[in-house]
Regions:
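Active-site neighborhoods and metal-handling regions in enzymes and metal-associated proteins
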Residues: 1-210
Length: 210
C-alpha cells in the first residue's frame, strides 16, 4: 500500500534525509586507497549517532552494518569488513540511511579512490546524470514508468545496461515502502504519481547489458 505523506511528515523526513546525506558526504570523503570499508562504515555510524539519529540499515533484515559498501563490479549490499581494503582506482558505492522522529532517509553515491580509469569515471557520471533525469520525470500526475524510462533511456543511449533485479522504493516510517521504483519502464504506464508520495530513485548501471 502506498502511503501519502502530509506536509508536516515531509518536513520531518527532510531532517532524516539531511542527516543521511551529510553522513554519506563524510563517509565519501574517507574513500582513499588503504582505508578499509569497516573504517568508512564506522565514520558513517558515528556521524549519524552524533546528530541524534539512528542508522536505519543496521540490523535491518539482519544486515550487520550502518552502510552497504560495494566496490567496482559489486552492485549493492556489500558488507563492510576490516579485511576489505580500498585500492587505487576503485570505485566505491556507499548506501546508507538515518532515522529520526520516526522517519527515514536513504542516500547513496559512488566515490572514486584516487585516480580512476576514464571508463569508470564515465560510468559514474552517466549514473549520476541518470538520477537527475529520473528526478525530472517524477512529477505529480505522471506515471512511475516515466521515471524508469527516463533513467533507462539515458543510460542505454550511452551504451550501458540498467540493473533490473533491484529497484528503488517508497520511503517513510519504513525504510522500504511501496511502490517499487524500477530503473526501466514505459512512459505513461505504471502507478500514478501523486502529491505526498516520497520515493527513492536508485539508478544501478552496468557496463554493457545487465
Amino acid at each position: 500500500m502506498i502511503v501519502l505523506k502530509t506536509a508536516k511528515e515531509i518536513e520531518l523526513m527532510k531532517e532524516a534525509c539531511r542527516i543521511s546525506a551529510e553522513a554519506l558526504k563524510v563517509a565519501g570523503e574517507a574513500v582513499k586507497p588503504g582505508v578499509t570499508t569497516w573504517e568508512i562504515d564506522h565514520i558513517a555510524y558515528e556521524y549519524i549517532k552524533k546528530h541524534g539519529a539512528e542508522p536505519n540499515f543496521l540490523h535491518l533484515y539482519g544486515f550487520p552494518a550502518t552502510a552497504c559498501i560495494s566496490i567496482n563490479d559489486e552492485i549493492i549490499h556489500g558488507i563492510p569488513s576490516k579485511k576489505r581494503v580500498i585500492r587505487e582506482g576503485d570505485i566505491v558505492s556507499i548506501d546508507l540511511g538515518a532515522k529520526i522522529h520516526g522517519y527515514n532517509g536513504d542516500n547513496a553515491a559512488t566515490f572514486a579512490a584516487g585516480k580512476v580509469s576514464d571508463e569508470a569515471k564515465r560510468l559514474c557520471d552517466t549514473t549520476k546524470e541518470s538520477l537527475y533525469k529520473g528526478i525530472e520525470a517524477a512529477v505529480a500526475g505522471g506515471r512511475l514508468g516515466d521515471v524508469g524510462h527516463a533513467v533507462q533511456s539515458y543510460c542505454e543511449d550511452r551504451g550501458y545496461g540498467v540493473v533490473r533485479e533491484y529497484t528503488g522504493h517508497g520511503v517513510g516510517t519504513k525504510l522500504h515502502e511501496d511502490p517499487s521504483v524500477p530503473n526501466f519502464g514505459t512512459p505513461g504506464r505504471g502507478v500514478r504519481l501523486l502529491p505526498g508520495m516520497v520515493i527513492a530513485i536508485e539508478p544501478m548501471i552496468n557496463e554493457g547489458t545487465a
